[in-house]
Amino acid sequence: MATKQHQDAPTPTRPKSTNGIINGTKASVGDPRVVVIIYGQGQERIVAVFADVLGKPYRLAARFSEVRGDDQGTVVGIAVGDAKADILSRNRVLLVTINAHCVALGMPPDVDLSAASDYEFLYTESPFFRRDLSRFIAFTLGQISHHEELTTKPRTYFISTTFPDVRTALSNLDILSVGSDAVEIRVDLLREPLPDGSFNPVPSLSYVGEQVMLLRQRTELPIIFTTRCTRENGKFPMDNPELFYQYLYRAIQWGCEYVDVEIWLPEEIRHRLFEQRGNSRIISAFHDFSGTFKWASPQAQTIFDESRKYGDIVKMITIINSVSENYELEYFRSQIKANNPEGPPLSAVNMGQLGQLSRSLNTVFSPITHPLLPIVAAPGQMSAAEINEALSTMGQLPKKNIYAIGSFRSSPQVTFFEKCFNELGLPHNFTSVDRSGVRGSIESFCHQPGFGGAYLSPALPANQPYIPILSDAARTIGTIDTVVVRGEGASASFIGDNATWKGIRATLTRDFAPSAYQDRAAIILSHSPEDAAPIIFALRSLNIGKMYSAGFKAPGPLAVGVEPFTSIESLQRVDHPFAIISALPSGKSHLVHPLLRHFSSTSRRSTPTIERKGSGGKGKVFLDLANGPRQSDPLAVAEQHGWTAYGVADTSAFTTVETLRLLIGQNVPYSFVRLASGPGLY
């Protein structure tokens, strides 16, 4: 089975995903094709897990020709041995094929099936592997996308793992990735050991695939897949461009969010990868180490024009000989931005110590390092903290006072935010203020010199006269939990936003793709419409179906599609709710127990059994937002009755991630929030 003959046909263009973007735009339905899972010997249960994550039924088939249009909305599993018979003749318009391979079996995946499939999911049956599966399948099917959200950020960064084996980095990855919006795996720096004690000159696809799998298991950040050649400070040989294609195309199949493609590669290969990129994004990369490249020359514009042909982001990296060339780059950057308002965005820096100014001024995917990394990926690379300190020195990052105003213990809050600010090298002060002790209104804080924003707990009503601008989420939900400052001095404006709903949605999609919620029923319990509003908004962003309320009346526009429980009879009309979310006070949280028992699922298991057909999609989610001492543990009750259960600590940590993005414009991963906050904060 020749590799090239089944790689030339591009994956059909996926629908544009909007799940990641701000202001509550609904999750994309994604790729409408029938999902076919190729499974290994004895691994049939992976089909049921895929179905559960997607919220769909499943069945097993003997060959691709048995899968027809009436399988729409069903996950179909085909065994490895059977799939080989007719995978090349499958209907690509009707089917999207994923080769699911368990690396714990001790053998690499079938090379021909890997190349012939649309995507490949490598996994180990670890306790949380379905979270990796959820992220993988939601991304590859176009239900989520990070790129649209990242393009709206004022600054984005990525960190490169320069380890010969990513296992070395995993223990420190929570700290390494603070401030990063993506993590790069440098495939050319990987060293695959051979039985004789030497190393493979080029790491095999199976070894690289496992390294990508390990990285995905330990970070929620998008992955940038890079194979740097010898001429561009890398180790991949340049004598075989088709070798680059094989690895870069496989990165798309593995669901890497970004794929770095060097522009020296033949145009035919770059064009092929761009057409086949699916939901991945191509970084079209140019590097010059000669020292002769000039930003003011016509060559610079020519390289940009060539790069943009097959790139979602253009990256240009050069060596310079004088500090003045940094200013030439800034002029070039301004011209590109002015002449290309629709993009693609330009990431451009000068290498070496002389070029560090350009690293501070670049705003698109600036490559950063960290003191814990063994080597820097390029000369002159800086950490996120060093860039922020440089920006502060230049007056581009003025010192601000950021507040937490509410009813919470100040000591853990201040300590945690100080950890974040120190790790990021930010000059800001953070103060926690008990609202009950505040003299005057919150407005007085907003008008203080150096006010840099605040987050509020409990949230404020959205109709505050001193906060004239509201996000769509805050306006619809009716409350503000974050005050964001845009601009400086007299021209500064205050924007009211709501981060809580994003924390709720992030929690709900940890183990399930957004499609699992589509048109399904949900039950919400709350004593307050204000507490229920962000829950309703989050569920609606996931295309939820009917919502049932208990203990509150849904406010305003959020009331559409929400039916209150008024009697036992109304409860009995609810058929298999997919989610139950309780915002009851901790002293009342036990009231949800009867619902959890009544709607218990006996088919929901951590390791589903497999039959020729299965209902799938019967997974159920319970989220308890109560904070404080309880009479009993509703999470334990939920898990005993087959629910996937989450507590307020999960949602609070995800909400903190979103709050920090709003207040300081930088990314602090969920894993670091949980690590650094300790038991005293949540």
Language-model segments: which ranges?
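Catalytic beta/alpha-barrel core
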Residues: 81, 162, 182-190, 201, ...
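Rossmann-like adenosine-cofactor binding region
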Residues: 561-646
